[in-house]
């Protein structure tokens, strides 16, 4: 007997078509799909169905990356499956180890790609192309996640519709094989914009907060997926070109989102941190997580989860990090973190910020102009203030504890503007331009900053005018400073721009080189040493900007592979670097061996 499961679109909007499956379940060898995709509206329904399957995988994807990274640790409430991820003892029985959730995405994409009539026209426009390209992009993204988690995986591009097809031997590919197989077709469509179905009403939470979904921002831009695959395979210039093309096409700047202490008086000449380590802050940085048609363009792609179980697929991430997004109660917790009293906090949270993360943030300088000063920029040991927003201190009863706020809205970010710019910095650095990478951290990538960016070498300016042409006459106006196109490090450190800030290329690089030397690295005064050190600086910035967003372990392993591919300190230097970062987790496996970075395949 055939068993067809109807696809449900996001937030419980059930499909009116029965021509595709969300979860492939069949009790015979007959094809259970209706291959006809000849209606123009089919594109929207199938695209939402594909994104529904992304929803079903996203919690696992976040937890695999964050539990195995260096920004989290377990506590007394942590469940066994999460503990096993954290100490690298997870077996195929671990509930978060499921390749199936990615192959479900892939098979849905394969079916759509195989059967969609891309020649359907409205006037002179091929109306099915944006959704077709979206299916290609999502499929490539899913394969990329599989390779990150499992190394070498089964690869197929035709839909599986029977038991015999499912059981047939499959071709095996690693990340390089995935790149070779999928990038050529993706490149044909890199200028195609994502589908846009307007704003979707997602209903209201159980405690009465309405939720709207910007449908354009739930899509995966093909250029960004391409850039990520190139970066994963150490093709740095190609990665940088993809990131630049997307930023240029969408005119995405590094916007001004900062955090500053609130004072009832003007900034003094000497700001001392409070002994408690907690600051009341003026917070513009968290505005970047607002998703609305009129909001900031920081969010590029996100996975919005349903407001309750009746409206679609829910997420367990807020609860694991300490927030009860699905409660029906209003908790008037005494919260010292500036959020409203209606926020619901969970003492029994299962994931803690690591001391490594706290130490990294606390070790940063905060830069400010004292009252009435035009040129003086001073330094205070306040630390990076993004931590004060990302990790909040909460008092509940007699217990004080920390919780992470990134998932309080029931959304999971895939791409932010800062994500793209930081990966661009990673690529530019490995191309041989650490000064260009530093510009993204310090000043923001803009031609109008050249007078201030005296650290840029002539060959770097030439590269940024020709190869990655931010500074070309054709593109320079797309990255102006009209809305303060500024460096990412300023989000948490404030005044990093310009020649008067203590945050300068030579000093920051020298500090990191000295740190590496203290760790026993044979540091010399060569361009290659500078590239390796700048890579560590970028890695630190990723920790502070993107903490707990579901990228960390993949970021660490990708960077470790960059280092292994560079002969500077030996072919296993990156693996040793990774193992040192994660040593505090007491992993049961030897992380100096790349094979131990991967999960067992079910």
Identify the meaning behind each predicted range.
Residues 20-72, 240, 577-602:
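Membrane-proximal, proline-rich intrinsically disordered regions
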Residues 39-46, 78-151, 166-180, 186-193, ...:
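Conserved, well-structured interaction surfaces
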Residues 47, 245, 252-451, 535, ...:
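Elongated scaffold/linker segments in the mid-to-C-terminal portions of large proteins
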């Amino acid at each position: 007997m055939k068993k067809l499961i109807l696809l449900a679109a996001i937030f419980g909007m059930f499909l009116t078509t029965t021509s595709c499956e969300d979860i492939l379940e069949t009790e015979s060898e007959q094809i259970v799909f209706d291959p006809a995709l000849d209606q123009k509206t089919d594109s929207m329904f199938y695209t939402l169905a594909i994104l529904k399957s992304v929803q079903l995988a996203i919690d696992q994807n976040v937890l695999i990356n964050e539990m195995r990274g260096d920004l989290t640790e377990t506590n007394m409430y942590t469940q066994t499956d999460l503990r096993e991820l954290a100490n690298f003892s997870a077996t195929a029985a671990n509930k978060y180890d499921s390749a199936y959730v990615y192959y479900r995405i892939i098979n849905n994409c394969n079916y759509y790609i195989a059967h969609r009539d891309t020649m359907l026209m409205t006037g002179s426009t091929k109306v099915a192309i944006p959704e077709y390209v979206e299916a290609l992009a999502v499929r490539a993204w899913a394969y990329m996640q599989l390779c990150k988690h499992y190394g070498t995986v089964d690869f197929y591009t035709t839909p599986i519709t029977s038991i015999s097809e499912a059981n047939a031997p499959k071709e095996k590919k690693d990340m390089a094989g995935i790149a070779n197989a999928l990038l050529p077709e993706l490149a044909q469509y890199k200028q195609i914009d994502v589908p846009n179905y307007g704003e979707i009403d997602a209903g209201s939470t159980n405690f009465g907060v309405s939720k709207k979904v910007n449908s354009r921002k739930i899509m995966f831009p093909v250029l960004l997926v391409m850039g990520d695959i190139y970066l994963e395979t150490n093709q740095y210039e190609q990665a940088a070109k993809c990131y630049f093309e997307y930023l240029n096409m969408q005119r995405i700047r590094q916007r001004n989102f900062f955090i500053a202490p609130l004072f009832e008086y003007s900034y003094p000449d000497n700001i001392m941190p409070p002994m408690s380590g907690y600051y009341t802050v003026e917070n513009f940085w968290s505005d970047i997580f607002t998703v609305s048609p009129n909001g900031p363009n920081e969010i590029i792609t996100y996975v919005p989860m349903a407001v309750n179980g009746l409206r679609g697929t829910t997420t367990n991430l807020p609860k694991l990090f300490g927030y009860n997004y699905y409660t029906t109660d209003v908790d008037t917790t005494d919260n010292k973190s500036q959020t409203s009293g209606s926020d619901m906090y969970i003492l029994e949270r299962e994931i803690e910020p690591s001391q490594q993360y706290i130490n990294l943030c606390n070790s940063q300088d905060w830069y400010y102009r004292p009252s009435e000063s035009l040129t003086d920029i001073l330094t205070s040991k306040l630390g990076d203030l993004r931590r004060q927003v990302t990790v909040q201190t909460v008092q509940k009863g007699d217990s004080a504890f920390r919780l992470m706020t990134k998932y309080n809205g029931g959304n999971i970010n895939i791409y932010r503007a800062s994500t793209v710019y930081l990966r661009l910095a990673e690529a530019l650095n490995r191309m041989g331009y650490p000064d260009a990478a530093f510009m993204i951290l310090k000043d923001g990538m803009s031609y109008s900053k050249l007078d201030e960016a005296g650290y840029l070498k002539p060959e770097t300016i030439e590269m940024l005018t020709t190869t990655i042409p931010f500074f070309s006459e054709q593109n320079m106006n797309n990255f102006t400073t009209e809305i303060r196109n500024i460096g990412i490090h300023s989000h948490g450190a404030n005044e990093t721009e310009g020649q008067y800030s203590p945050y300068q290329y030579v000093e920051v690089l020298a500090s990191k080189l000295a740190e590496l030397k203290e760790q026993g690295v044979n540091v010399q005064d060569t361009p290659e040493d500078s590239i390796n050190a700048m890579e560590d600086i970028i890695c630190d910035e990723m920790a502070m900007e993107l903490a707990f967003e579901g990228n960390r372990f993949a970021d660490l392993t990708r960077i470790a592979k960059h280092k292994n591919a560079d002969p500077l300190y030996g072919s296993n230097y990156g693996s040793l670097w990774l193992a040192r970062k994660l040593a505090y987790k007491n992993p049961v496996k030897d992380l100096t061996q790349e094979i131990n970075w991967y999960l067992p395949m079910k």
